[in-house]
Amino acid sequence: MSVRVDRAAAQTATVSFDRLNPLGRKVAPNTNALALIIGVDSYKSTSARAIYADSDAQVFSDYATQKLGISPGRIKTLVNDGAGEREMLLSVKSWLSRSVKQNQSDVYIFFAGHGLASDDGSKMYLLPYDGAPELLDKTAILRDELFADISAANPRSVTVFLDTCYSGTTRGTDMLIASRPIAIRALEQSIPDNFTVMTAAAGDQTAKPLEEAKHGMFSYFLMKGMEGEADANNDNEITAGELHSYVQANVIQQSSGSQTPELQGDADRVLVRFQ
């Protein structure tokens, strides 16, 4: 990645970022892998947007093919009003469960949109298009239950990318719940043994957009890293640890330290294999 600074005048500077490009270096196919990709920018029950989340998901679909080696027929993408609670749950309980080859399939989950924690921080939720922030238990997807449903399909591995936060803040300036004026710190939770989870921010932080690139900040550097930027030792493979290190360093820099991506699980898991 290169960052260019153009000075139109002594007092102004415009930073521009390279366009994302999933083409380029070829990767080895991952025949049995599959991906469920979800992005919700605009919601039915709240005016607070998750800016660029839908385009993040649509572009990540190309990276799933071109950089994770997944066949297009084994990728399911849900965006905006197509990512309601029913559609999300059926995609996991029906489509994913049928598509997984037990102990052979690597599963990839990408979610960009709003997340929320319970008032005590003990539960983490992903908000579907038709979810109501004030009724999390009834209308949102509990992260632990989502992971349990995926794990029940018995895949070989599961890698989850979450461009969301759980503090109740948004990619803009709004709070998801007006009656909750302060950010809630989500408590760290355990994950199943074969899961690796990369999240955009710490439990009490906001997952921000990268306005210059018109993507979520985490999503932009995630995909830029998958192009090859994250291959720190130049061995033609990108591990979860390498990708996380690249994303974390760039997000911390661009957010001036206010957003710190986190990694749970196997840092040595190879995600991208260049030919």
Predicted regions mapped to residue ranges:
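Extracellular S/T/G-rich loop segment that most often corresponds to the catalytic His/Ser-adjacent loop
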Residues: 158-220
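Active-site-proximal beta-strand/loop segments in catalytic clefts of secreted hydrolases
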Residues: 36-41, 78-82, 110-114, 127-131, ...
